[in-house]
Amino acid sequence: ITGASRGIGEAIALRAARDGANIVIAAKTAEPHPKLPGTIYTAAKAIEAAGGRALPLVVDIRDEAQVAAGVASAVERFGGIDILVNNASAISLTGTAQTPLKRFDLMMGINTRGSFACTQACLPHLKSAANPHVLTIAPPPNLDPRWFKDHVAYTIAKYGMSLLVLGQAEEFRPLGIAVNALWPRTII
C-alpha cells in the first residue's frame, strides 16, 4: 500500500490487518512530521497489533529504483504480491496562479506517474498471483467544470490516476488482473 503511513492508506492497511494480511507500507515518512501524525514505523506497529504482518519501507514512488527495490523486498519477505493499493497522493487545492510548477510536478509525479510506476513494477508478480488486484484511490472521471475550477492541477493529477484505472482494467483483463478505483469522497 503506497502512502500507508497515515490517513486513508493506513486505514486500508489496518482493515486488511484484521484479516491477517501481509502488508508493505511503502511511504516516504520515516520521521515524524511536525503537523501530520504517523510514520511507516507507527503504521507497522498498528498493523501488527491488529493481526497483520508488516514490512515498513521508505519508498518515494517517483523514484523507479526505490519502487523496484520495494517490490523486490515485498516479494522476498512475503513470497509475492496479490494486491497493489495505489494510495499515495500529493494535494494542493490551489488555482492556476497559486500553483507553482514545482507543486504541479510533485502532484503529477506522485499521483499519476508514481501510480503507473508501482503498477508496472508489481505487474510481473501480479501475473502469478491467485487473485490479483490493483486498487487505486481515484475519483470517477467527471468532466463537469466545477471539479476543475478551483484546483485544476490537482484534479488533472487525480484524473490521471482515474484514467490509469480505466486503461489498465482493459489492458490487464486478459491476464485476470482486476483493476478498480475507490473514491471515498464522504471521508475526504
Regions found by a protein language model. Give the residues of each.
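Substrate-binding pocket helix/loop in short-chain dehydrogenase/reductase
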Residues: 95-96, 100-105
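A short, exposed helix-loop element centered on a Lys and neighboring polar residues
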Residues: 119-120, 166
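Short SAM/SAH-binding signature in class I
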Residues: 82-83
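Catalytic loop of short-chain dehydrogenase/reductase
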Residues: 127, 133-174, 185-188
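Structural signature of the Rossmann-like NAD(P)-dependent dehydrogenase/reductase core
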Residues: 1-2, 86-89, 132-139, 178-183
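Short-chain dehydrogenase/reductase
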Residues: 1-78, 91-92, 102
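A short helix-coil junction within the Rossmann-fold of NAD(P)-dependent oxidoreductases
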Residues: 19, 77-78, 94-95, 121-130, ...
